[in-house]
Amino acid sequence: MADNDKNSCSCSFCGKVHSEVRKLIAGPSVFICNECIDLCSGILQEEGSSYKKGDTLDLKPKEIKKVLDEYVIGQEHSKKVLSVAVYNHYKRLSNSGIISDVEISKSNVLLIGPTGSGKTLLARTLARVLQVPFAMADATTLTEAGYVGEDVESILLKLLQAANFNVEAAQRGIIYIDEVDKISRKSENASITRDVSGEGVQQALLKVIEGTVSSVPPQGGRKHPHQEFIQINTDNILFIFGGAFDGLEKIIESRHQGSNMGFEANVQKASKDKDIFCYTEPEDLVKFGLIPEFVGRIPVITSLGELDEATLCRILVEPKNSLVKQYKKLFEMDNINLEFDDSALSEIARKAAVRKAGARGLRAILENLLLDLMFETPGTFNVDQIVISKQMVEESMVNSRLFLKH
Protein backbone atom coordinates (compact mmCIF):
# COMPACT_ATOMS: atom_id res chain seq x y z
CA MET A 1 0.00 0.00 0.00
CA ALA A 2 1.42 3.39 -1.01
CA ASP A 3 2.02 5.97 1.69
CA ASN A 4 -0.76 8.21 0.33
CA ASP A 5 -3.19 5.28 0.35
CA LYS A 6 -2.17 4.39 3.89
CA ASN A 7 -2.79 7.89 5.16
CA SER A 8 -6.17 8.06 3.40
CA CYS A 9 -7.34 5.07 5.46
CA SER A 10 -8.42 5.78 9.02
CA CYS A 11 -9.86 3.85 11.95
CA SER A 12 -13.65 3.81 11.75
CA PHE A 13 -13.83 4.14 15.56
CA CYS A 14 -11.21 6.70 16.66
CA GLY A 15 -10.45 8.33 13.29
CA LYS A 16 -6.67 7.92 13.49
CA VAL A 17 -4.86 7.39 10.18
CA HIS A 18 -2.43 4.56 9.45
CA SER A 19 0.67 6.59 10.28
CA GLU A 20 -0.63 7.37 13.79
CA VAL A 21 -1.10 3.74 14.87
CA ARG A 22 0.91 0.54 14.79
CA LYS A 23 -1.62 -1.53 12.87
CA LEU A 24 -4.77 -0.81 10.89
CA ILE A 25 -6.93 -3.85 10.13
CA ALA A 26 -9.33 -3.69 7.18
CA GLY A 27 -12.81 -5.15 7.07
CA PRO A 28 -15.77 -4.80 4.66
CA SER A 29 -15.76 -0.99 4.14
CA VAL A 30 -14.40 -0.39 7.68
CA PHE A 31 -11.04 -0.20 9.47
CA ILE A 32 -10.05 -0.68 13.11
CA CYS A 33 -6.69 0.18 14.70
CA ASN A 34 -4.71 -1.83 17.25
CA GLU A 35 -5.42 0.77 19.97
CA CYS A 36 -9.20 0.38 19.62
CA ILE A 37 -8.81 -3.41 19.61
CA ASP A 38 -6.84 -3.23 22.88
CA LEU A 39 -9.48 -0.92 24.38
CA CYS A 40 -12.36 -3.22 23.42
CA SER A 41 -10.47 -6.24 24.70
CA GLY A 42 -9.90 -4.54 28.04
CA ILE A 43 -13.60 -3.69 28.39
CA LEU A 44 -14.63 -7.27 27.63
CA GLN A 45 -12.11 -8.70 30.10
CA GLU A 46 -13.28 -6.30 32.80
CA GLU A 47 -16.93 -7.25 32.29
CA GLY A 48 -16.05 -10.93 32.18
CA SER A 49 -14.08 -10.76 35.42
CA SER A 50 -16.58 -8.64 37.34
CA TYR A 51 -18.43 -11.78 38.41
CA LYS A 52 -15.28 -13.69 39.33
CA LYS A 53 -14.73 -11.80 42.55
CA GLY A 54 -16.60 -14.54 44.39
CA ASP A 55 -13.78 -16.95 43.51
CA THR A 56 -10.96 -14.84 44.91
CA LEU A 57 -11.82 -15.73 48.51
CA ASP A 58 -11.04 -12.20 49.62
CA LEU A 59 -13.85 -12.60 52.16
CA LYS A 60 -13.37 -15.18 54.88
CA PRO A 61 -16.37 -16.71 56.75
CA LYS A 62 -16.20 -14.15 59.58
CA GLU A 63 -16.15 -11.30 57.06
CA ILE A 64 -19.07 -12.76 55.10
CA LYS A 65 -21.12 -13.03 58.29
CA LYS A 66 -20.18 -9.48 59.26
CA VAL A 67 -21.67 -8.18 56.02
CA LEU A 68 -24.76 -10.36 56.50
CA ASP A 69 -25.15 -8.80 59.95
CA GLU A 70 -25.55 -5.39 58.30
CA TYR A 71 -28.69 -6.52 56.46
CA VAL A 72 -30.09 -9.48 58.42
CA ILE A 73 -30.94 -9.14 62.11
CA GLY A 74 -30.93 -12.26 64.29
CA GLN A 75 -30.61 -15.82 62.91
CA GLU A 76 -26.98 -15.96 64.10
CA HIS A 77 -26.50 -19.71 63.62
CA SER A 78 -27.94 -19.70 60.10
CA LYS A 79 -25.68 -16.81 59.08
CA LYS A 80 -22.66 -18.71 60.40
CA VAL A 81 -23.67 -21.91 58.58
CA LEU A 82 -24.25 -20.04 55.32
CA SER A 83 -20.96 -18.13 55.59
CA VAL A 84 -18.97 -21.35 56.00
CA ALA A 85 -20.89 -23.20 53.27
CA VAL A 86 -20.43 -20.41 50.74
CA TYR A 87 -16.76 -19.94 51.62
CA ASN A 88 -16.10 -23.66 51.18
CA HIS A 89 -18.02 -23.68 47.89
CA TYR A 90 -15.98 -20.90 46.28
CA LYS A 91 -12.77 -22.25 47.84
CA ARG A 92 -13.58 -25.50 46.05
CA LEU A 93 -13.96 -23.62 42.75
CA SER A 94 -10.76 -21.64 43.19
CA ASN A 95 -8.75 -24.80 43.80
CA SER A 96 -10.51 -27.02 41.28
CA GLY A 97 -7.39 -27.16 39.12
CA ILE A 98 -5.10 -27.90 42.08
CA ILE A 99 -6.93 -30.59 44.01
CA SER A 100 -6.95 -33.71 41.85
CA ASP A 101 -6.80 -36.63 44.27
CA VAL A 102 -9.88 -35.65 46.31
CA GLU A 103 -13.17 -34.55 44.78
CA ILE A 104 -15.01 -32.10 47.03
CA SER A 105 -18.80 -32.11 46.74
CA LYS A 106 -20.95 -29.01 46.45
CA SER A 107 -22.32 -27.49 49.66
CA ASN A 108 -25.93 -26.93 48.60
CA VAL A 109 -27.98 -25.48 51.45
CA LEU A 110 -31.51 -25.94 52.79
CA LEU A 111 -33.01 -23.14 54.91
CA ILE A 112 -35.97 -24.21 57.05
CA GLY A 113 -38.00 -21.49 58.70
CA PRO A 114 -41.39 -19.76 58.89
CA THR A 115 -42.58 -17.07 56.51
CA GLY A 116 -40.79 -13.76 56.97
CA SER A 117 -37.86 -15.21 58.95
CA GLY A 118 -35.26 -13.99 56.44
CA LYS A 119 -34.58 -16.97 54.14
CA THR A 120 -34.84 -15.03 50.88
CA LEU A 121 -33.02 -12.00 52.29
CA LEU A 122 -30.09 -14.18 53.41
CA ALA A 123 -29.70 -15.73 49.96
CA ARG A 124 -30.03 -12.41 48.13
CA THR A 125 -27.56 -10.68 50.46
CA LEU A 126 -25.03 -13.49 49.99
CA ALA A 127 -25.09 -12.99 46.23
CA ARG A 128 -24.62 -9.24 46.69
CA VAL A 129 -21.68 -9.78 49.05
CA LEU A 130 -19.94 -12.21 46.70
CA GLN A 131 -20.80 -10.21 43.56
CA VAL A 132 -22.03 -13.25 41.67
CA PRO A 133 -25.15 -13.64 39.50
CA PHE A 134 -28.25 -14.49 41.51
CA ALA A 135 -31.58 -15.97 40.42
CA MET A 136 -34.65 -16.74 42.49
CA ALA A 137 -37.51 -19.10 41.69
CA ASP A 138 -40.67 -20.35 43.36
CA ALA A 139 -40.85 -24.14 43.41
CA THR A 140 -44.67 -24.05 43.25
CA THR A 141 -44.52 -22.71 39.67
CA LEU A 142 -42.32 -25.56 38.44
CA THR A 143 -43.64 -28.62 36.64
CA GLU A 144 -42.04 -31.63 35.03
CA ALA A 145 -40.87 -31.17 31.43
CA GLY A 146 -43.73 -31.56 28.95
CA TYR A 147 -46.45 -30.18 31.24
CA VAL A 148 -48.01 -26.74 31.53
CA GLY A 149 -45.88 -24.49 33.76
CA GLU A 150 -42.21 -23.60 34.09
CA ASP A 151 -39.55 -26.27 33.76
CA VAL A 152 -36.23 -26.29 35.62
CA GLU A 153 -34.39 -24.80 32.62
CA SER A 154 -36.36 -21.58 33.18
CA ILE A 155 -34.42 -21.10 36.43
CA LEU A 156 -31.13 -21.38 34.57
CA LEU A 157 -32.40 -18.81 32.05
CA LYS A 158 -33.06 -16.38 34.92
CA LEU A 159 -29.48 -16.90 36.09
CA LEU A 160 -28.16 -16.28 32.58
CA GLN A 161 -30.21 -13.08 32.38
CA ALA A 162 -28.80 -11.94 35.73
CA ALA A 163 -25.31 -12.53 34.32
CA ASN A 164 -26.11 -10.61 31.10
CA PHE A 165 -25.81 -13.95 29.27
CA ASN A 166 -22.20 -14.34 30.38
CA VAL A 167 -22.19 -18.15 30.55
CA GLU A 168 -18.94 -18.40 32.50
CA ALA A 169 -20.25 -16.04 35.17
CA ALA A 170 -23.63 -17.79 35.34
CA GLN A 171 -21.90 -21.13 35.89
CA ARG A 172 -20.51 -19.77 39.18
CA GLY A 173 -23.71 -18.08 40.36
CA ILE A 174 -26.25 -18.76 43.10
CA ILE A 175 -29.82 -20.00 42.61
CA TYR A 176 -32.37 -19.69 45.41
CA ILE A 177 -35.50 -21.86 45.15
CA ASP A 178 -38.22 -20.95 47.65
CA GLU A 179 -41.23 -22.99 48.80
CA VAL A 180 -39.35 -26.24 48.18
CA ASP A 181 -41.54 -27.92 50.80
CA LYS A 182 -44.50 -27.49 48.42
CA ILE A 183 -43.00 -29.97 45.93
CA SER A 184 -42.95 -32.84 48.43
CA ARG A 185 -44.64 -35.96 47.17
CA LYS A 186 -48.07 -36.79 48.51
CA SER A 187 -46.91 -39.77 50.54
CA GLU A 188 -43.65 -41.31 51.68
CA ASN A 189 -44.19 -44.31 49.40
CA ALA A 190 -43.53 -43.96 45.69
CA SER A 191 -46.72 -43.41 43.72
CA ILE A 192 -47.70 -45.17 40.48
CA THR A 193 -49.54 -42.04 39.33
CA ARG A 194 -47.80 -39.02 37.80
CA ASP A 195 -47.01 -36.22 40.27
CA VAL A 196 -45.92 -33.48 37.84
CA SER A 197 -45.59 -30.71 40.42
CA GLY A 198 -44.19 -32.79 43.29
CA GLU A 199 -41.91 -35.78 42.93
CA GLY A 200 -41.63 -35.13 39.19
CA VAL A 201 -40.12 -31.69 39.85
CA GLN A 202 -37.73 -33.15 42.42
CA GLN A 203 -36.53 -35.68 39.84
CA ALA A 204 -36.05 -32.90 37.27
CA LEU A 205 -34.15 -30.76 39.77
CA LEU A 206 -31.89 -33.68 40.71
CA LYS A 207 -29.95 -33.59 37.46
CA VAL A 208 -29.42 -29.84 37.65
CA ILE A 209 -28.37 -29.87 41.31
CA GLU A 210 -25.83 -32.69 41.02
CA GLY A 211 -24.26 -31.20 37.90
CA THR A 212 -25.12 -31.52 34.24
CA VAL A 213 -24.87 -29.62 30.97
CA SER A 214 -28.32 -28.15 30.32
CA SER A 215 -29.58 -26.76 27.04
CA VAL A 216 -31.35 -23.49 27.79
CA PRO A 217 -33.50 -21.71 25.17
CA PRO A 218 -32.36 -18.04 25.26
CA GLN A 219 -35.89 -16.75 24.61
CA GLY A 220 -37.46 -18.93 27.28
CA GLY A 221 -40.50 -21.12 26.77
CA ARG A 222 -40.67 -24.79 25.97
CA LYS A 223 -38.00 -26.45 23.85
CA HIS A 224 -38.60 -27.34 20.21
CA PRO A 225 -36.23 -28.98 17.72
CA HIS A 226 -35.50 -25.97 15.49
CA GLN A 227 -34.33 -23.42 18.06
CA GLU A 228 -30.87 -22.54 19.29
CA PHE A 229 -29.76 -23.37 22.83
CA ILE A 230 -27.21 -22.03 25.28
CA GLN A 231 -25.20 -24.78 26.97
CA ILE A 232 -24.69 -24.18 30.69
CA ASN A 233 -22.79 -26.47 33.07
CA THR A 234 -24.40 -26.59 36.53
CA ASP A 235 -21.49 -28.35 38.30
CA ASN A 236 -20.40 -25.16 40.08
CA ILE A 237 -23.74 -23.40 40.60
CA LEU A 238 -24.60 -23.15 44.31
CA PHE A 239 -28.23 -24.04 45.07
CA ILE A 240 -29.95 -22.69 48.18
CA PHE A 241 -33.43 -24.00 48.99
CA GLY A 242 -35.95 -22.53 51.40
CA GLY A 243 -39.25 -23.61 52.86
CA ALA A 244 -41.52 -23.32 55.89
CA PHE A 245 -42.09 -27.12 56.16
CA ASP A 246 -45.32 -26.87 58.14
CA GLY A 247 -45.87 -30.21 59.87
CA LEU A 248 -42.20 -31.21 59.97
CA GLU A 249 -42.12 -30.51 63.70
CA LYS A 250 -44.58 -33.39 64.29
CA ILE A 251 -42.29 -35.78 62.40
CA ILE A 252 -39.30 -34.68 64.50
CA GLU A 253 -41.27 -35.10 67.73
CA SER A 254 -42.51 -38.57 66.78
CA ARG A 255 -38.96 -39.67 65.94
CA HIS A 256 -37.83 -38.79 69.45
CA GLN A 257 -40.70 -40.48 71.26
CA GLY A 258 -39.20 -43.26 73.33
CA SER A 259 -35.67 -41.86 73.05
CA ASN A 260 -33.58 -41.19 76.15
CA MET A 261 -35.30 -38.78 78.52
CA GLY A 262 -32.69 -36.02 78.40
CA PHE A 263 -32.67 -35.65 74.63
CA GLU A 264 -36.45 -35.99 74.38
CA ALA A 265 -36.83 -33.26 76.98
CA ASN A 266 -34.64 -30.98 74.86
CA VAL A 267 -36.83 -31.63 71.81
CA GLN A 268 -40.02 -30.91 73.76
CA LYS A 269 -38.53 -27.68 75.09
CA ALA A 270 -37.41 -26.72 71.58
CA SER A 271 -40.92 -27.38 70.31
CA LYS A 272 -42.33 -24.89 72.79
CA ASP A 273 -39.63 -22.37 71.91
CA LYS A 274 -40.25 -22.79 68.13
CA ASP A 275 -36.65 -24.06 67.68
CA ILE A 276 -37.48 -27.70 67.03
CA PHE A 277 -36.32 -27.45 63.40
CA CYS A 278 -32.71 -27.37 64.60
CA TYR A 279 -33.11 -31.13 65.31
CA THR A 280 -34.01 -31.88 61.67
CA GLU A 281 -32.41 -35.00 60.21
CA PRO A 282 -32.43 -36.10 56.53
CA GLU A 283 -34.80 -38.95 57.40
CA ASP A 284 -37.36 -36.40 58.66
CA LEU A 285 -37.31 -34.62 55.29
CA VAL A 286 -37.81 -37.94 53.49
CA LYS A 287 -40.85 -38.67 55.66
CA PHE A 288 -42.11 -35.17 54.91
CA GLY A 289 -42.11 -36.00 51.20
CA LEU A 290 -38.72 -35.14 49.71
CA ILE A 291 -37.18 -38.06 47.84
CA PRO A 292 -33.96 -39.51 49.35
CA GLU A 293 -31.87 -38.66 46.27
CA PHE A 294 -32.95 -35.03 46.48
CA VAL A 295 -32.19 -34.78 50.21
CA GLY A 296 -28.81 -36.41 49.59
CA ARG A 297 -27.81 -33.56 47.26
CA ILE A 298 -28.34 -30.97 50.01
CA PRO A 299 -25.69 -31.66 52.67
CA VAL A 300 -26.10 -28.41 54.63
CA ILE A 301 -29.36 -28.00 56.55
CA THR A 302 -30.00 -25.07 58.88
CA SER A 303 -33.10 -23.63 60.51
CA LEU A 304 -34.27 -20.08 61.08
CA GLY A 305 -36.26 -19.33 64.20
CA GLU A 306 -39.48 -17.38 64.42
CA LEU A 307 -38.73 -13.69 64.97
CA ASP A 308 -39.70 -12.40 68.40
CA GLU A 309 -40.93 -8.90 69.23
CA ALA A 310 -37.49 -7.57 70.23
CA THR A 311 -35.88 -8.79 67.00
CA LEU A 312 -38.70 -7.34 64.90
CA CYS A 313 -38.15 -3.98 66.59
CA ARG A 314 -34.44 -4.13 65.68
CA ILE A 315 -35.30 -5.08 62.09
CA LEU A 316 -37.28 -1.85 61.78
CA VAL A 317 -34.24 0.38 62.36
CA GLU A 318 -30.89 -1.45 62.37
CA PRO A 319 -30.25 -2.91 58.88
CA LYS A 320 -28.58 -0.73 56.26
CA ASN A 321 -31.77 -0.73 54.23
CA SER A 322 -34.22 -0.94 57.15
CA LEU A 323 -37.90 -0.18 56.58
CA VAL A 324 -37.78 2.95 58.73
CA LYS A 325 -34.81 4.27 56.73
CA GLN A 326 -36.64 3.54 53.49
CA TYR A 327 -39.79 5.41 54.51
CA LYS A 328 -37.79 8.29 55.94
CA LYS A 329 -36.03 8.60 52.57
CA LEU A 330 -39.36 8.57 50.72
CA PHE A 331 -40.71 11.42 52.86
CA GLU A 332 -37.39 13.25 52.63
CA MET A 333 -37.86 13.40 48.85
CA ASP A 334 -40.93 15.56 49.59
CA ASN A 335 -38.90 17.69 52.04
CA ILE A 336 -40.64 16.14 55.05
CA ASN A 337 -38.79 14.80 58.09
CA LEU A 338 -40.42 11.56 59.28
CA GLU A 339 -39.72 10.42 62.85
CA PHE A 340 -40.89 7.49 64.98
CA ASP A 341 -41.21 7.45 68.78
CA ASP A 342 -39.55 4.44 70.41
CA SER A 343 -42.94 3.44 71.79
CA ALA A 344 -44.38 3.55 68.27
CA LEU A 345 -41.67 1.21 66.97
CA SER A 346 -42.33 -1.21 69.84
CA GLU A 347 -46.05 -1.21 69.06
CA ILE A 348 -45.42 -1.88 65.36
CA ALA A 349 -43.18 -4.83 66.32
CA ARG A 350 -45.83 -6.12 68.73
CA LYS A 351 -48.52 -6.02 66.05
CA ALA A 352 -46.23 -7.85 63.60
CA ALA A 353 -45.44 -10.53 66.19
CA VAL A 354 -49.17 -11.11 66.72
CA ARG A 355 -49.68 -11.54 62.96
CA LYS A 356 -46.90 -14.19 62.86
CA ALA A 357 -45.84 -13.01 59.39
CA GLY A 358 -42.29 -12.17 60.42
CA ALA A 359 -40.50 -9.24 58.81
CA ARG A 360 -43.07 -9.16 55.98
CA GLY A 361 -45.70 -8.20 58.53
CA LEU A 362 -43.72 -5.07 59.41
CA ARG A 363 -44.01 -3.66 55.89
CA ALA A 364 -47.74 -4.38 55.74
CA ILE A 365 -48.30 -2.52 59.02
CA LEU A 366 -46.18 0.45 57.95
CA GLU A 367 -47.90 0.69 54.57
CA ASN A 368 -51.30 0.80 56.24
CA LEU A 369 -50.06 3.22 58.89
CA LEU A 370 -48.50 5.70 56.46
CA LEU A 371 -50.89 5.37 53.52
CA ASP A 372 -52.95 8.51 54.22
CA LEU A 373 -49.85 10.53 55.00
CA MET A 374 -48.17 9.47 51.76
CA PHE A 375 -51.36 10.43 49.92
CA GLU A 376 -52.04 13.80 51.60
CA THR A 377 -48.65 15.37 52.35
CA PRO A 378 -46.96 15.65 48.92
CA GLY A 379 -47.43 19.25 47.81
CA THR A 380 -48.57 20.37 51.27
CA PHE A 381 -46.21 23.27 51.98
CA ASN A 382 -47.04 23.78 55.67
CA VAL A 383 -45.88 20.27 56.70
CA ASP A 384 -42.17 19.67 57.11
CA GLN A 385 -42.09 17.18 60.01
CA ILE A 386 -44.22 14.21 61.04
CA VAL A 387 -43.73 12.24 64.26
CA ILE A 388 -45.41 8.84 64.58
CA SER A 389 -46.56 8.04 68.13
CA LYS A 390 -47.71 4.83 69.80
CA GLN A 391 -51.30 6.08 69.87
CA MET A 392 -51.23 6.63 66.11
CA VAL A 393 -50.07 3.05 65.60
CA GLU A 394 -52.73 1.70 67.97
CA GLU A 395 -55.52 3.61 66.31
CA SER A 396 -54.07 3.46 62.78
CA MET A 397 -55.45 7.00 62.39
CA VAL A 398 -52.27 8.83 61.53
CA ASN A 399 -54.11 11.76 59.98
CA SER A 400 -55.53 12.70 63.35
CA ARG A 401 -52.17 13.68 64.85
CA LEU A 402 -49.59 15.48 62.77
CA PHE A 403 -46.72 17.12 64.61
CA LEU A 404 -45.77 20.07 62.46
CA LYS A 405 -42.59 22.08 62.68
CA HIS A 406 -42.55 25.38 60.77
From Swiss-Prot:
<dbReference type="InterPro" id="IPR010603">
    <property type="entry name" value="Znf_CppX_C4"/>
</dbReference>
<dbReference type="GO" id="GO:0008270">
    <property type="term" value="F:zinc ion binding"/>
</dbReference>
<dbReference type="InterPro" id="IPR050052">
    <property type="entry name" value="ATP-dep_Clp_protease_ClpX"/>
</dbReference>
<feature type="binding site">
    <location>
        <position position="14"/>
    </location>
    <ligand>
        <name>Zn(2+)</name>
    </ligand>
</feature>
<feature type="domain" description="ClpX-type ZB">
    <location>
        <begin position="1"/>
        <end position="52"/>
    </location>
</feature>
<dbReference type="InterPro" id="IPR046425">
    <property type="entry name" value="ClpX_bact"/>
</dbReference>
<dbReference type="InterPro" id="IPR003959">
    <property type="entry name" value="ATPase_AAA_core"/>
</dbReference>
<keyword id="KW-0067">ATP-binding</keyword>
<feature type="binding site">
    <location>
        <position position="33"/>
    </location>
    <ligand>
        <name>Zn(2+)</name>
    </ligand>
</feature>
<dbReference type="InterPro" id="IPR019489">
    <property type="entry name" value="Clp_ATPase_C"/>
</dbReference>
<feature type="binding site">
    <location>
        <position position="11"/>
    </location>
    <ligand>
        <name>Zn(2+)</name>
    </ligand>
</feature>
<comment type="similarity">
    <text>Belongs to the ClpX chaperone family.</text>
</comment>
<dbReference type="Pfam" id="PF07724">
    <property type="entry name" value="AAA_2"/>
</dbReference>
<feature type="binding site">
    <location>
        <position position="36"/>
    </location>
    <ligand>
        <name>Zn(2+)</name>
    </ligand>
</feature>
<dbReference type="Pfam" id="PF10431">
    <property type="entry name" value="ClpB_D2-small"/>
</dbReference>
<dbReference type="Pfam" id="PF06689">
    <property type="entry name" value="zf-C4_ClpX"/>
</dbReference>
<dbReference type="GO" id="GO:0140662">
    <property type="term" value="F:ATP-dependent protein folding chaperone"/>
</dbReference>
<comment type="subunit">
    <text>Component of the ClpX-ClpP complex. Forms a hexameric ring that, in the presence of ATP, binds to fourteen ClpP subunits assembled into a disk-like structure with a central cavity, resembling the structure of eukaryotic proteasomes.</text>
</comment>
<keyword id="KW-0862">Zinc</keyword>
<comment type="function">
    <text>ATP-dependent specificity component of the Clp protease. It directs the protease to specific substrates. Can perform chaperone functions in the absence of ClpP.</text>
</comment>
<keyword id="KW-0479">Metal-binding</keyword>
<dbReference type="GO" id="GO:0051301">
    <property type="term" value="P:cell division"/>
</dbReference>
<dbReference type="GO" id="GO:0009376">
    <property type="term" value="C:HslUV protease complex"/>
</dbReference>
<dbReference type="InterPro" id="IPR003593">
    <property type="entry name" value="AAA+_ATPase"/>
</dbReference>
<protein>
    <recommendedName>
        <fullName>ATP-dependent Clp protease ATP-binding subunit ClpX</fullName>
    </recommendedName>
</protein>
<dbReference type="InterPro" id="IPR027417">
    <property type="entry name" value="P-loop_NTPase"/>
</dbReference>
<keyword id="KW-0547">Nucleotide-binding</keyword>
<dbReference type="GO" id="GO:0051603">
    <property type="term" value="P:proteolysis involved in protein catabolic process"/>
</dbReference>
<dbReference type="GO" id="GO:0016887">
    <property type="term" value="F:ATP hydrolysis activity"/>
</dbReference>
<keyword id="KW-0143">Chaperone</keyword>
<dbReference type="GO" id="GO:0051082">
    <property type="term" value="F:unfolded protein binding"/>
</dbReference>
<dbReference type="InterPro" id="IPR004487">
    <property type="entry name" value="Clp_protease_ATP-bd_su_ClpX"/>
</dbReference>
<dbReference type="InterPro" id="IPR038366">
    <property type="entry name" value="Znf_CppX_C4_sf"/>
</dbReference>
<feature type="binding site">
    <location>
        <begin position="114"/>
        <end position="121"/>
    </location>
    <ligand>
        <name>ATP</name>
    </ligand>
</feature>
<dbReference type="GO" id="GO:0005524">
    <property type="term" value="F:ATP binding"/>
</dbReference>
<dbReference type="GO" id="GO:0046983">
    <property type="term" value="F:protein dimerization activity"/>
</dbReference>
